[in-house]
Design a protein with these regions (language model features):
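Active-site environment of divalent metal-dependent phosphoester hydrolases
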Residues: 15-17, 41-44, 84-87, 110-113, ...
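Short, acidic/polar
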Residues: 16-26, 85-96, 190
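Hydrophobic faces of well-ordered beta-strands that scaffold small-molecule active sites
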Residues: 7-12, 34-36, 75-79, 102-106, ...
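Conserved, mostly hydrophobic/aromatic
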Residues: 11, 26, 95, 130, ...
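Catalytic pocket-lining loop regions of alpha/beta-barrel enzymes
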Residues: 116-241
Length: 289
């Protein structure tokens, strides 16, 4: 089992009190670093944030900022941006200058109106500001490859990362998008459309929640290996980033399951594992080892 020396997780969720716990598990698993998306689950939705006039939520990341300050070699973070925040440009500039602030995230896949806005250019002002400030942007907008293609063409200087394999799991599809579930063949055909985004050199793919999206266990992982092979063949290992989404795994798999299913994959060369399990993220986010 080949193992890269520098494993970096592209997405974990932690909140108050979670830094020491995350470090202990990372040390046990041999994970060198992780990108934090601070998002608290349970209680009030979308915490932490400041609530602005008109119901606009301004996400903040106090735990992630603290983690990056205390352990700059182990943690960096992204910041979510509300597309309706009137001060979005200032927030993006502040993140650009913040220690450990590496990227932005938007989530138009959370509701049908947001999906429609993404497809029709309603997020373009955020994309433009991200590109102007040199910040990569992760977008959670599953089942919407045409909207990603439009954005990639409109903003060729934007480093755009497709979240979570670019497709919904059926549970997310029926709840978030209010769409009917898809069979396995339909899901794979949709994923092929996502892979066509590899034609845009400014687009990368986050390999996260794959076990839920394709309904196959992360460990041992044999069912996912051919699908990941297709992704690497399309994008190249330099544009595929592994993410555990630790603490919010839809199938209840532990961090070790999610990592070791990748490490045990015989379809990836040692060099490809090095890229997918860390080097791609560091390269795209300008995060030195």
């Amino acid at each position: 089992m080949s193992r890269p020396a520098d494993i970096v997780d592209t997405q974990i969720h932690i909140g108050p009190g979670g830094i020491a716990e995350a470090l202990a598990q990372m040390d046990a698993l041999g994970i060198k670093a992780a990108l934090i998306d601070e998002y608290w689950f349970g209680g009030a939705p979308n915490k932490p944030h400041h609530l602005l006039a008109g119901g606009v939520q301004r996400p903040v990341a106090p735990t992630a900022e603290l983690a990056a300050q205390l352990h700059p070699d182990r943690f960096s973070y992204l910041l979510r941006v509300d597309v309706d925040d009137p001060d979005y440009a200032q927030i993006i500039r502040q993140l650009r200058d913040a220690q450990g602030g590496r990227a932005l995230r938007v989530d138009p896949g959370m509701s049908p109106p947001r999906r429609k806005a993404f497809a029709e250019g309603g997020y373009d002002h955020v994309f433009k500001a991200a590109a102007e400030n040199g910040l990569p942007l992760f977008a959670f907008a599953p089942d919407n490859p045409a909207a990603f293609a439009r954005a990639a063409k409109a903003f060729p200087d934007l480093r755009l990362i497709v979240d979570h394999c670019g497709v919904f799991s059926n549970s997310m599809r029926t709840s978030f998008a209010q769409l009917p579930p898809l069979g396995e063949a339909e899901q794979m055909a949709l994923f092929d459309s996502v892979l066509a985004l590899a034609d845009h050199p400014n687009v990368a793919l986050k390999w996260g929640h794959s076990s839920a999206m394709f309904d196959k266990p992360a460990w041992p992982g044999e069912g996912l290996w051919p699908i990941l092979r297709k992704a690497v063949n399309a994008f190249g290992a330099e544009r595929v980033m592994w993410a555990s989404d630790f603490s919010v795994n839809q199938r209840g798999e532990c961090w070790a399951d999610l990592l070791y299913g990748m490490l045990g994959n015989p379809d990836l060369s040692a060099g490809e594992k090095e890229w997918v399990l860390g080097k791609a993220l560091r390269t795209w986010l300008n995060w030195p080892a």
